[in-house]
Regions:
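Catalytic strand-loop segment that frames the active site of acyl-thioester-processing enzymes
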Residues: 1-15
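A generic structural signal for short beta-strands and their flanking turns/coil linkers
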Residues: 5-9, 35-37, 63-67
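Long, contiguous binding/interaction regions
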Residues: 2, 6, 22-25, 51-54, ...
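A short, flexible low-complexity segment enriched in Lys/Arg and Gly/Pro that occurs
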Residues: 1-3, 29-35, 96
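Compact, glycine-rich, soluble single-domain proteins
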Residues: 12-54, 58-61
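C-terminal structural segments of small proteins and small subunits
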Residues: 62-97
């Protein structure tokens, strides 16, 4: 019997322009490196696929918005690496400032 490994991580949008097309594409590019991992992103009652640029943009995440990333599948090591890459991206404000 296989168990689905799930991690959850919150990130705060810190860049002035929020989650527009370029940051959304950066997130999707990172997530797509991990083929066996599924990612959902939640903001209040909205939940979208983390591999969808349009879905991420539909969250209307402005500066100061907190997003919950739900990461499923793959190995624990891959999930931790993915979280680390996303953390760096959010902390560096998507390299916009």
């Amino acid at each position: 019997m296989a168990f689905l490994i799930q991690s959850r991580q919150k990130f705060c949008v810190k860049n002035r322009l929020g989650l527009h097309a370029t940051p959304a594409a950066m997130i999707v590019k990172i997530i797509n490196k991990y083929k066996e991992i599924g990612v959902w992103v939640r903001h209040f009652d909205e939940q979208v696929n983390g591999k969808s640029i349009m879905g991420l943009m539909m969250l209307e995440a402005y500066c100061g918005t907190e997003l919950l990333f739900i990461i499923e599948g793959g190995s624990i090591a891959d999930q931790r690496t993915l979280i680390g890459e996303l953390k760096e991206l959010f902390e560096k404000k998507f390299f916009e400032e």
